[in-house]
Amino acid sequence: MESLLSSSSLVSAAGGFCWKKQNLKLHSLSEIRVLRCDSSKVVAKPKFRNNLVRPDGQGSSLLLYPKHKSRFRVNATAGQPEAFDSNSKQKSFRDSLDAFYRFSRPHTVIGTVLSILSVSFLAVEKVSDISPLLFTGILEAVVAALMMNIYIVGLNQLSDVEIDKVNKPYLPLASGEYSVNTGIAIVASFSIMSFWLGWIVGSWPLFWALFVSFMLGTAYSINLPLLRWKRFALVAAMCILAVRAIIVQIAFYLHIQTHVFGRPILFTRPLIFATAFMSFFSVVIALFKDIPDIEGDKIFGIRSFSVTLGQKRVFWTCVTLLQMAYAVAILVGATSPFIWSKVISVVGHVILATTLWARAKSVDLSSKTEITSCYMFIWKLFYAEYLLLPFLK
């Protein structure tokens, strides 16, 4: 650790450390909370021993920089040594929830819930179908799928701890908030609970959806001979397409159609469109997710399309694919025999296509922050599509 104290005094005060406002620079990285203490005298009792401290340019503030996004603003004086200790139990609980929230990759959780809700309503044929029986079937599918989703994203983090220290240092395994053993316990528990629920529900479409997702998610991430398919760009994209485009649409639709409603298998026009459209979207997500991660992927030998073809080319390929998908959706919506379906489908997809183009033109491809923000915007378009799908008839 390198430390530099110039023209400053450091004294112990009330169980903490007191720095007078002078130039202070301590160089050391660890798990840190972010604090901003604006005072000529600052008493700080950091949660962790080593902190990265830099003045904010005005000489009167102490900045501690974190490895994840949570920020706290604290004013403390020598007469308030308990400033960092109050409500410690509540704070510990909130921190635990925050760590699990980041571990679960919430954008995938939202996508899973919306996709299952949307395709489930594709099986609704009449108003009387909307009943407690339908919502019970949806709840069974959502809970089982969410637990499997946590297994898949958790296993990916366990396999990518070193890469995530470069690409996603805010994730709890990469930051050290979770130990490897904790991560293993979480993914093992959620996979077992997912299969248990799928089995007791007694729906074969649901159980096979969970099983195939488990197999593909494991093969995608785990570092074993002939596996860790994420190393190969085309195979990785096919895994994501299989789960997000095919399994989600068909298996969960059949869960409602055959298990909940007890009807024969029937592939409707909206289901076929949803599967085709989400195939495009899943390819885009598979390609786009690696654009901001190019630095770590290069270091650890992950041959993503962004590494081999370049960020700019992959970025505009993704935008073009989505615009093509929206054009097809507009044409399909325009052929609907129902006026209300035609209006909602056409207007909705025109708005989404226009919004995507405007956002893409504004992205600075040299900024990892902007690319990551645009990737999360792609997920919002993904959510919006699932809101539109039930209106396609």
UniProtKB/Swiss-Prot annotation:
The chain crosses the membrane at residues 108-128, 133-153, 170-190, 205-227, 232-252, 271-291, 314-334, 338-358, 371-391. GO terms for cellular component: chloroplast; chloroplast membrane. Disruption phenotype: Reduced seed longevity, severe seedling growth defects during germination and high levels of lipid hydroperoxides and hydroxy fatty acids. Its EC number is 2.5.1.115. Signal peptide: none annotated. Keywords: Chloroplast, Membrane, Plastid, Transferase, Transit peptide, Transmembrane, Transmembrane helix. GO terms for molecular function: homogentisate phytyltransferase activity. It catalyses: phytyl diphosphate + homogentisate + H(+) = 2-methyl-6-phytyl-1,4-benzene-1,4-diol + CO2 + diphosphate. It is a multi-pass membrane protein. It is an enzyme of class 2 (transferase). It is found in: Plastid, Chloroplast membrane. InterPro entries: AtHST-like, UbiA_prenyltransferase, UbiA_sf. Residues 1-36 form a transit peptide. Pathway: Cofactor biosynthesis; tocopherol biosynthesis. GO terms for biological process: cell wall organization; phloem sucrose loading; regulation of defense response; response to temperature stimulus; unsaturated fatty acid biosynthetic process; vitamin E biosynthetic process. Seeds and plants overexpressing HPT1 accumulate increased levels of tocopherol. Involved in the synthesis of tocopherol (vitamin E). Catalyzes the condensation of homogentisate and phytyl diphosphate to form dimethylphytylhydrquinone. Low activity with geranylgeranyl diphosphate as substrate, but no activity with farnesyl diphosphate or solanesyl diphosphate. Tocopherol functions to limit lipid oxidation during seed desiccation, quiescence and germination and early seedling development. Protects thylakoid membrane lipids from photooxidation and is required for low-temperature adaptation. This is Homogentisate phytyltransferase 1, chloroplastic.
